[in-house]
Amino acid sequence: MPALIEIEDICKVYNPGENEVRALDGVNLKISKGEFVAIIGQSGSGKSTLMNMLGCLDVPSFGQYFLNGRDVSTMKDDDLSDVRNKEIGFIFQGFNLIPSLTAVENVELPLIYRGISKEERKELSVKALEIVGLSHRMDHKPAEMSGGQQQRVAIARAIAAKPPVILADEPTGNLDSHSSKEILEILKELHKTGRTVILITHDNDIAAQAKRVVRIKDGKIEQDYLNDDTESTK
């Protein structure tokens, strides 16, 4: 299967020169369409920097990043913004919902920037909320929902436009164990429908929910293995 994401020898260097810091140091990674991959590492490992690269929130100092066949590693800010809007659905630890908007309005908001008509925006948003089990909460504002429900709204917002990549950064970090389990089950169900899911975490138990685990340490990929076959793929 051709790679949806292909990173070639990527480095991210801060303070070049005598006191330089290599947050990423020669990272190579391929992710195929439809994979469910967990990227795990402790604080300072480089996982957040790698997430920023994968999400087109930053560009590498060296190396190339191909997303859906396009080299995004040298794109300007406006072009990267367009890629983020069309190619990637983000789920963050903080739900990032607008308090004054209802659930369906929060889900609709990013679709406006894609130039989608009002009728289609509503249809896509309602469908996304149904997928995450919140059809009964569409007209509720964030303050009227639990943390787990708010994160489900955030997932609906990420998937509404059907982007090729779902990028989830510590999506259970602010949730209790019950809500965390619900969110992980939703991500698994999304993967079963053929969506590409990339989960960023520091937690081994959460990483174990993915089909593939990529461990990063000191800016390098330390391990890359399948959860149902622990033999390293490197």
Role assignments for model-derived ranges:
Residues 2-216:
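ABC family nucleotide-binding domain
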Residues 213-225:
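H-loop (His-switch) and adjacent beta-strand-loop-beta switch element
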